[in-house]
Amino acid sequence: MSGGVKLIAGLGNPGDQYARTRHNVGAWFLETLAQQRNQSLAKENKFHGFVAKCNDYWLLKPTTFMNESGQAVAALARFYKIKPSEILIAHDELDFPAGDIRLKEGGGHGGHNGLRNIIQHLGSSDFYRLRIGINHPGYKDRVTPYVLSPPSENDRIAILAAIEKGLRLIPELVQGDFQKVMRELHS
């Protein structure tokens, strides 16, 4: 992959009942980024989401449910001719503790239905993922209710700190300095 990020999408489910849930931490990331950049996210039906143009890159918060996120990402990417390698997806990551944040280049969906749908709609897995740790409930049968509930106060504070850490590295992501971002986040 080469070049910098031209599209940043933050995954989550629409609606107030999901806004504070663990599954929406990608949307938390995107909303905070838009606020920091003084951008208003405007609803764009053709992109199935809320969108803002931020200098040389786009912000996207899908209005689809998580497992249909690919509709929004692919619609905006195709319209603006953004390659998968120029896309960053911010999402919740069960396999990391709350407070961890890591950048991953390409790969599979790891059981994440939002990523699975994005791969399907793009026809490629060659995009970047900003994986925001939310902890794991310990048992597979508890995952759905866990991700659809709010984090504990301690976990929420750790998640917000991880988001801030990721937001500080947006300039490097846009410039394509992915190795620097990985060094910063993974050390």
Curated annotation (Swiss-Prot):
Site (Discriminates between blocked and unblocked aminoacyl-tRNA) residue list: N13
Protein name: Peptidyl-tRNA hydrolase
Any Pfam family: Pept_tRNA_hydro
Any one biological process term the GO annotation gives: protein quality control for misfolded or incompletely synthesized proteins
Keyword annotations from UniProtKB, A to Z: Cytoplasm, Hydrolase, RNA-binding, tRNA-binding
Chain positions recorded as tRNA binding sites: Y18, F65, N67, N113
Catalytic activity: an N-acyl-L-alpha-aminoacyl-tRNA + H2O = an N-acyl-L-amino acid + a tRNA + H(+)
Subunit field text: Monomer.
Provenance organism: Coxiella burnetii (strain CbuK_Q154) (Coxiella burnetii (strain Q154))
Top-rank EC class of the record's enzyme: hydrolase
Compartment(s) of residence: Cytoplasm
Site (Stabilizes the basic form of H active site to accept a proton): D92
HAMAP family given in the database record: Pept_tRNA_hydro_bact (MF_00083)
